[in-house]
Amino acid sequence: FQAEDGIRDVERSRGLGDVYKRQIEIKSNFKTVPGLTVILIGEDPASKIYVKNKEKFSKEIGIDSKVIRYPENIEEKVVLETIIELNQNKIVSGILVQLPLPKHINKQKVIETILPEKDVDGFHPINVGNLSSGYDSKIPCTPQGCFLLLKEVEKNLSGKHAVVIGRSNLNGKPMAQLLLKENCTVTITHSKTKDLKSECNRADIIIAAVGKPQLVKGDWVKKNAIVIDVGINKTAKGIVGDVDFKEVSKIAKAITPVPGGVGPMTIACLLSNTVECFKSCLLYTSDAADEGLGVDLGGRRI
């Protein structure tokens, strides 16, 4: 976070540090470590960098991380078959299919093939439903990371007016759910919102996750607002976010830079979810054995 008192490296101290402690406890108690398998399809530069960072931080804290790489033209059925095999593999605690996918592969079908217990991204419909219903759930990593960063700056979010720019299933909607659970008044904006600037001007918290370079300007933000920039946009001047950092940083109480703001926290939350998936899989297999249940080809109970 870039705040009035300078940069605080919360993503490493509070994010990875906490995951490391839990991973050490698991290794001590179960004589094994959580396993994360990532499926990477194609040669998208941003995806390759992101996956490389996941591998690096996994190794740092002792999570067993593997990457399965496929070319851009891989058949959808091969990807689905791989996921089914990973569902049945007891060594694999968490499964992640790196997005975006090639157009010929059905994203929703891929997401729904992953066991909810192994869904580290929190995208499976069961996890989405649990989150929206207020039940325990795997929470999508980027919104979860944004939420934890928010709590570093503002412990009590109750009654705050939050504007979420973007309504995607991956970021905008789950972010809104997390804010609602904290008793924020939440406004979700999108491409059809008539006066986005005025909506932002009223906000105590702005979450920008729409993919438009430097959309949010300084005169959109009120004094001492908290601004979280999820956007990653490639421009002639380099990588920029959805927020004009130079302008907004002069006004906001706290703002995340791009790159280097939300990204590291997203990875920390991914690894945290991997640890939680390890625990879920232990409960799942234990319950299934107790009840005399088997599994189908997708790894689900029958």
Question: What is each model feature region?
Answer:
Residues 1-20, 284-302:
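Single conserved hydrophobic/aromatic residue that forms the stacking wall/gate
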Residues 42, 66-76, 191-193:
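Short beta->alpha junction loops
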Residues 46-55, 140-216, 220:
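Glycine-rich phosphate/diphosphate-binding loop of Rossmann-like nucleotide-binding domains
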Residues 58-72, 186:
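Short beta-strand elements in bilobed, periplasmic/extracellular small-molecule ligand-binding domains
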Residues 78-89:
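Short, well-structured alpha-helical segments in soluble
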Residues 97-157, 175:
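Anion-binding alpha/beta catalytic cores of soluble intermediary-metabolism enzymes, centered on
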